[in-house]
Structure formats: C-alpha cells, structure tokens
C-alpha cells in the first residue's frame, strides 16, 4: 500500500492528515506599546509639548518537518536514528523602538487681519532588533520532536548550524515651520529641517530639507464679494525637497564580506572569504524634489474643480556593480539613480441633488510622464 505521506495520484498534493500530524510550525509573538506626553501653555498662544513612545516586539517559532513527509519509512528510534532529510529550525527574536518628540508652537493673531503660526521641534528615534536561529537539516534524530540536541553527527549527517542577526538604527531631526496669512486672502508657509540617519556614511548622515508654498484666495477679495455664484477660487504654488532614508539596508555604506569555496591546505579544507560589498562614506539621502501649481474653483455650491500640475524628481540609492577589470567582484551602494515624473491631475465633483435625497459624483483624470 502507498505510504500515507506520499504524493497523491496527481503527484502534487500530500494527504492533508500527514501534514497535520507530521508537520509542526508553532509561532508565538507579543507586542507592547506605551506612550506618554506632557503639555503646558505658559502664556497665551504658546504651547510646549513633549511625548515619548516605546514599542517592543518578541517572537518565537518552532518548525519541524519529519521524514514521513518525504515518503520515508520510520525504522529508527531515539538511540539508533536513521531517518533522512528531516528539516527543523527554532527562531527567536526581540526588538524595540523608542521615539521622543518635543515641540514649541506659537499661534497669534494681531490687528485682526494678521495670523501667524510658528513651530520649532526636535525628534529622536532609536530602533534595535536581534534575531537568532538554530537549524538542523540533517540525517540526525528528530531534534525538536525528541528535544535531543546531544546527537550531532549520525550516518554522515551535517552538524547543527546556527545564525544570528543584529541591527540598530538611529535618527534625529531639528525642524522649524512658519505659516502666515493675511485676512484669509494670502497664505505663506515655509519649513526647514535638518535630519540625521545612521543608515548613511559619516560624511553624509546629515541632510537639509526645506519647502515653501503660496496661496491666493481670490474669493476673499473685495471685488469678488458680489459674485455670489462663485463659492471658491484659489491659486496655489509650492516647492519642496524632502529626504528618505528607508532604503531597505541599515548598513548599506559599510563593507561586507561573504564566504566562498574552501581551499585545501594539505588535508585540511580552509574556508575563504571575499569582499562582496564596498564601503561608500559618501552615500547620502534620497532626495525628492516636488513642484506644484494648482487652482480650485467651486460654483453654485454644487460643482468643484481641482487642477494640479506637478513635477517630481527623486534620487535613488541603489547597488552598482564594480567592473570586473578591477579584479574583484561585488557592488557598492551609491546615489546612482533618478526618476522624474511630471503631469497633470484633474478632479471634478458634483452634487446635483441635496436634501432628503442627495447624489454626489466624482470624476478624476490624470496624465503622467515618467523617465
């Protein structure tokens, strides 16, 4: 009779009972989140606020697949194991994230027509993760099922293997923002910030980023007061540069080493290593530049049109292969790529019916050129 763990007639799917009985994949995780803040208003218009957030993550996984799932017969026992091709590992991990933010905001209106809102602040973030894994993909005794780690080499089996991984990330920023409007007609805003990230080389960890915008609310002008069918007419323009450090590698700027084939000296096999990634102290922030021009129009309290023209340019951090004529293989992370998007976006929304029964329709159209 066919073994119950063998593949079925179509040679693609095993008996689900064997998967349930002979496969173990236990997972456990816990996540905690805590936060606190303190806020005070010492004088009118001034708000001082500081906040702290702390998050922890812990996880554990036990995975085991017996030889039965490979169609092997069970003929061994704890003292004389002879199972082949078993697969198991135990994975444990822990990480935490700490975030602190402090801001001072001042909001004031003077002479009834001038409104000013300013803010300065500081952010700090620290993230740490640790992971350890123990593997056994050998001919040894079922390690997790028997909880027997004393058997290390049975029937030519490989030794137990293990690995660990640790990473940390530090970020801080100082920033300032100002928003001014005159009688709700003219709005001016600007911001500047200095960010630092441990993901970049020592020479480029700090980056300066800024933005500015202007808006003219035409319907607030005196010469527009008698045009009652026009709800809103506004012109907008903005330009800014933002930074991105989420590049998928906490240590992209550091040299890395990988293992290669063994080299035999006499009767001994010696493992060899080679540089697979090279240091780049000039690796810096991905910078995103964006310029927008737009206008908003609303009429008859029923129809609204929003039009935006934009141009966005993004720098990209990417690995660049080292030419083979250097005599070495590998890659180095560089600010080597760039993407440009420009186009137009139009949105039209209408509410032809209002009251007990209402009907709202929104249409959007866009065109984008990418290179």
Can you annotate each of these PLM segments?
Residues 2-65, 76-371:
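Extracellular/periplasmic, surface-exposed regions of secreted and cell-surface proteins
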């Amino acid at each position: 009779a066919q073994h119950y763990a063998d593949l079925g007639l179509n040679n693609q799917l095993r008996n689900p009972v064997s998967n349930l009985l002979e496969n173990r994949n236990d997972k456990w995780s816990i996540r905690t989140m805590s936060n606190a803040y303190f806020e005070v208003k010492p004088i009118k218009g001034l708000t001082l606020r500081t906040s702290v957030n702390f998050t922890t993550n812990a996880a554990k996984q036990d995975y085991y697949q017996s030889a039965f799932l490979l169609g092997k017969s069970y003929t061994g026992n704890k003292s004389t194991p002879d199972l082949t091709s078993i697969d198991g590992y135990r994975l444990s991990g822990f990480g935490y994230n700490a975030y602190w933010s402090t801001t001072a905001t001042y909001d004031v209106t003077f002479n009834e027509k001038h409104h000013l809102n300013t803010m300065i602040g500081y952010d700090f973030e620290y993230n740490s993760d640790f992971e350890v894994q123990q593997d056994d993909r050998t001919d040894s005794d079922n390690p997790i099922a028997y909880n027997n780690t004393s058997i290390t080499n049975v029937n030519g089996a490989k030794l137990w293997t293990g690995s660990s991984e640790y990473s940390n990330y530090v970020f801080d920023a100082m920033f300032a923002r100002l928003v001014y409007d005159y009688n709700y007609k003219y709005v001016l805003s600007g911001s500047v910030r200095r960010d630092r990230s441990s993901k970049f080389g020592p020479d480029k960890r700090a980056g300066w980023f800024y933005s500015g915008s202007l808006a003219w609310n035409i319907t607030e002008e005196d010469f527009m007061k008698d045009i009652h069918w026009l709800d809103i007419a506004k012109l907008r323009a903005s330009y800014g540069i933002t930074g991105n450090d989420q590049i998928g590698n906490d240590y992209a700027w550091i040299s890395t080493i990988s293992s290669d084939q063994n080299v035999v000296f006499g009767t001994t096999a010696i493992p060899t290593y080679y540089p697979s990634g090279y240091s780049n102290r000039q690796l810096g922030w991905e910078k995103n530049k964006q310029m927008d021009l737009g206008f908003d129009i609303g009429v008859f309290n029923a129809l609204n049109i929003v039009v935006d023209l934009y141009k966005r340019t993004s720098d990209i951090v990417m690995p660049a292969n080292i030419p083979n004529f250097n005599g070495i293989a590998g890659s180095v992370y560089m600010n080597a790529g760039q993407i440009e998007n420009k186009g137009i976006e139009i949105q039209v929304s209408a509410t032809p019916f209002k009251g007990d029964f209402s009907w709202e329709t929104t249409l959007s159209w866009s065109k984008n050129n990418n290179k």
